[in-house]
Amino acid sequence: TEIDAFAVHAARANARLNDVPMQVLHADLVGCDDGWDVVLAGDVFYETEAGAAITDWLESLHDRGALVLIGDPGRAYLPKDKLSIMTRFEAPRAGDLEDQDVGAARVWRFSAPSRGLPELED
């Protein structure tokens, strides 16, 4: 799902171009729980209030057993104290929208030592 109509259109176009069957919904699921096993969140910690609500929601999904993965370019409101880094890489930035061509991106997960997933140093 995506809350931005332009991003929904872009995701659908990308799926078509790559012959990937995918359903993209224009909806806000924060606070919902349909029993997902895996939850992916991308670049969602850019505002204080929204970041707090999203953190609470993702943490509740994690606490009931979902694997919660977060892609983040280093936003200020990322709850690093609740997360572990899974991987990091250099990612191209969006030209005129960013002040650098390439930046560090990371994939985080809510900390869960019992799941046996590897830890990386930041």
Name every feature range the model reports, one short phrase each.
Residues 1-122:
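S-adenosylmethionine-dependent methyltransferases
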